């Protein structure tokens, strides 16, 4: 079973994504509100990090860059999400994929499947 670490601050999106991912057979871990994303990802070693670009207390692109600079941080596939079209910026900082919100479930699943 593939594991997904979810870094998203919108609780409605957390609930929706968790339900969709579990229905598709993924094991989901949701980031705690005060958790250090990079530290948590390196500790839990998920197959995929699904991370929002704009969170209340942090910038997903900065977290992505920090993850990629950390030892072992390049082993995790990262799919970034945002309501803003910042795909190029995400890819330049090491994301494996980007999905623009709002998105259909099948679009999400196709992106996740493409990550292996």
Language-model features: locations:
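Acidic catalytic/metal-coordinating carboxylates
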Residues: 33, 59-62
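Short amphipathic alpha-helix used as the core "switch/output" element in two-component signaling
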Residues: 39, 61-74
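Active-site residues of response regulator receiver
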Residues: 52
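Alpha4 helix (beta4-alpha4-beta5 surface) of REC/receiver domains from two-component response regulators
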Residues: 62, 84-100, 107-110
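Conserved acidic carboxylate
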Residues: 8, 82
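Acidic, metal-coordinating helix/loop segments flanking the phosphotransfer/catalytic sites
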Residues: 30-48
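The feature encodes the CheY-like receiver
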Residues: 56
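Two-component/phosphorelay signaling modules centered on CheY-like receiver
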Residues: 11-29
